[in-house]
From Swiss-Prot:
Keywords: DNA replication, DNA-binding, DNA-directed DNA polymerase, Mitochondrion, Nucleotidyltransferase, Plasmid, Transferase. Pfam families: DNA_pol_B_2. GO terms for molecular function: DNA binding; DNA-directed DNA polymerase activity; nucleotide binding. PROSITE patterns: DNA_POLYMERASE_B. PANTHER family: DNA POLYMERASE, DNA-DIRECTED DNA POLYMERASE. Its EC number is 2.7.7.7. GO terms for biological process: DNA replication. Belongs to the DNA polymerase type-B family. It catalyses: DNA(n) + a 2'-deoxyribonucleoside 5'-triphosphate = DNA(n+1) + diphosphate. InterPro entries: DNA-dir_DNA_pol_B, DNA-dir_DNA_pol_B_CS, DNA-dir_DNA_pol_B_mt/vir, DNA-dir_DNA_pol_B_mt_lin_plsmd, DNA/RNA_pol_sf, DNA_pol_palm_dom_sf, RNaseH-like_sf, RNaseH_sf. This DNA polymerase requires a protein as a primer. Its main location: mitochondrion. This is Probable DNA polymerase.
Amino acid sequence: MLILLLQYNVSNPCLTNLLENKTGTGVGLNFPLKPARLTLAQQRKRSELKKARLALRGMGIGDFNRELRFYSTSAYTKTHWNNKDRINKWMQYDIFVDRDFESFLSHLFSDNRILFEYTYALLVKVRKGNKFYTIGDRQIGVLFVDIHDPFLLEVFDTIIDRLAILFEEYPTELEYTCDALLLEFHPVRPEKIKISNLKDAKEKLAPKTFATGMSVFNLIGGFDLRKVSTPINLNKKRYYSTQVDRLNGFITDNPRLLEFKQKFNEQLFMASPKKKLKYEFCDTSVVFILVKRGREYIVIEDVKDGEFHKRIFNKTASLLLHLIDKSNGDGTWTRINGNFNTLYNLENEIIMSTKAIGLRAIPKFLYNKKNEEEMSVLANPNLGTIDLETTTGAQPKCYAIGFYTNLDSKPIKFYIDKNLDSCQLVHTCIQEMMRYKYRNVLFYAHNLGKFDAVFLLKELLRFNLTTEGLNNPYEFPAPLTRNSDILKLTIKRTVDGKTRKVTIMDSFALLPRSLRDLCKDYNIDNPKSYFPYLFSVDSHLFYTGATPNINYYLDIPKAEYLKLVKDDWDFKDETLEYLNLDLISLHQVLVKVNKAINFLFDIEFTSCATVSSLANKIFLSKFYDDKNKAIPLVKDIDLFNDIHEAYYGGRVEVFNPIIMADSTKSYYYYDVNSLYPFASINDIPGLKCTFYEVVKANVNIHELFGFFYCKIKSPDNLYLGLLPKRTETSLIFPGGAWEGWYFSEELKFAVAHGYEVEIIKGYNFDRVSNVFNEFVQEVYKVKCNPNNVTEKNIAKLILNSLIGRFGMNINKIKTSLVPSEKHNELLTTRVVKSTTDLGSGMFMDIYVPGIDKNICEDFNLDYIEVLNSTNTDEKGTMPDNNVSITTAAAVLSYARIHMAQIMLFILENNGTLYYTDTDSIVTDLKLPEEMVHQTEIGKLKLEHTITQGYFIADKTYAIVNTEGEIIKRAKGVKSSKLTLEDYEKMYNKEVVEATKTSSKRNYKDGFVTISDSTVKLNPTSYTKRSRVISKDKWIGTEIIRLDKLNSKLSTHTPKSLSGDKTK
């Protein structure tokens, strides 16, 4: 066999040209260059330094902020590095495509941040859009002796090699190109690395140096190889520069062939001395020299055991790519490329492609040792409350403010002076809260995000413009937000030469009910009182006289008003007393809840910002088995986005709009006991995931378990749709034909009832059983058998708040309070979701942290320059470690299946459906006893026996039960202001006026206005099913057929599942 061999040329022309320019001015270097020839002492020093270089394993495709891991041969210890030490060097992709080594050096050392004789862990990443791919499966340990170090060229060539392989593995995602390359240099301080079995580790991990590789493997021959300019793509035969014809076998007496074999195996052994690898050449071996973009590769093809193998090596015998083609014996063959498998027919047409996807488990929540030492058997007593009162009118202002903690016998309160200076009022209160005695207190405001934060920020920012404030301003680091609502506000300022801070949380995010309802729920001794809000205007702040008229009060029963009437009513005194009660009652609620949660679950209530995060922490710390019943942690953006399309909410539909008053017939309103907890005890997707893309194969849905994009066709004459679909405004359950993402179990349920399903692509998982069983059983037991009303309410809250947390969006956004200069930078470099003018030259911006190429180009900014700018921050925001869209989507699917089974049972037993809302059903069929139970999870509880009812639209209905009670619901307006006759008018297509309460936040001027307005309710607004009209009367509904409807996908996602409701 004839073999073409490659002579590796050390004298790269780019490097030679650079070295000849000793001043470095030609390539933008601002330091003198040393002579090209090294002294013996310098060479010895380089050798010593190279021996100290560490190679670091880890890192594959995924997120772009992770900890570094240092491994020994037997164990590893994680070392967390401060990202402030990281040096980011962004480079144009064209530098590597054109093998422009000179530009590579110029960019690398242009700002003198990369130091010589210093060890770094180098991680190379490709950016395509807003997604990062790590190049290769390991970091590179680098230590540059000086500008002449040949190892620089090896790093450059290694990046080109890894680019080639990356583009092969992700051809669809990257399309053989990218936007930019990021070189992350993480300084490695050997004195801070603690590795067990260090001696063996150094031997194993020590990188081979450029010089060593060059001397051991110098391929023989001096051939003029043709330079080609094509995309970096190894797996294309038409790109081969030279093909070597196969003779009678590889093993011949040709000395060049024997020397190649010897040198190749020597280098292969050198590359992995522990594994002692040796390549076994056979009679079928064929060797190619492949030139790509001026980069030389060795390609060896073999046929072994009926399998065709193609391996691609670089010039130092490092394996870059291994393809295997094998026959399946049934007229098909499979190509294996790492974790990619492609099935072909004999015509070389793709039948199906699969790709194994590795998923990590959500980690079990564990207290670290420091936290365990600090934990007490008692609940955290350092709780405080803060509240403020505001005037009404066009521009409300804060006129009273106070706080309460367990450190004081009574609340500390402040009232506005006669100059009506709200700025000084708020400043005085916050300064008092910054006293040393309150340093460990975590304060809560009920509805902070929608109310209190607006006034607090405005007045403190106004204070920053005063002489005192300019010298010592307030700061507001990294507020925690949700949908532009501030959930956590930290206020910092220097007091007596020391930095003090006050942290305020939104208690409504943890206990999503009004304070008045919370006082009732938890049997509070000092319940919330009533106050004449409409009387709170500037001119009344120092009023004394008779009690204001009842019309100044909102929603106060007359009996309660009469208790408040007196002749010597003082506005200031009444305000402070009202404020006093609010502070104490909220504090009592928080203390009760905190103690109960600590008693039941050994969890600190104060460690969580929302009720869903609290439920998640309880589950992960007390009930989760991450070894045997692991939940997949979904951080990959493509996987998340696809499965999120299958994340549908509950069904809310009107089937029949009216129940006529009839004393001879009964109707029933049923609720399912804890629907979502019940649904969660089914099997959920595990860690083993395979992506399927079906081209010609027929796939049986009953053999799959996961999420799939399908063509759907429903049966004709369908009354009850079984599969959901999003429209621009809502979620419907249509008939007809369409395509969409669905959970396999919901597809199987639909197929069993006549649907036709054709799978196009999707993700198949293994099954995991009993993941939530213990959690549901134990918490549900507390709910059904509580020691007190507090435990019952907490158990109910925790049960209903867990699953939604797993469905949180991983596309994390960041909220910052920034001055106008930073605000302008964000607007021109990032995707800004929301911006709020706070006044005083400050803005609250909610944005995607990563710099966006399209935004930069819109504003005529150089993308690479922006990335390399020291004024920009590209760290990003890491997704949470407890997000699993697969779990959330599967549980909601099981819940819809359960509800559909009940509705199908009613229809099959000649019952009539009237209305359903997520976990409730209204029907005229009395369900059998085996389906009904007051407390058993998953069974139905009879809430009402109905004598009359009107069902106008989703969440808009009125029913009358056998006790004569009228239960009214009206979406978006005050149902208390509507009468039963109003619902009857809407049924008869009459427009009805209703009262809507609106809240408008004005951060710039620092106030919130809450007002009632009159709106008209459209009686024909229901569009989730087609209205059936007979003799001008609405008599029922039928499903919408998508072959008659041009519907579009929307961003409609499940709501009210996480427990994080807004007021």
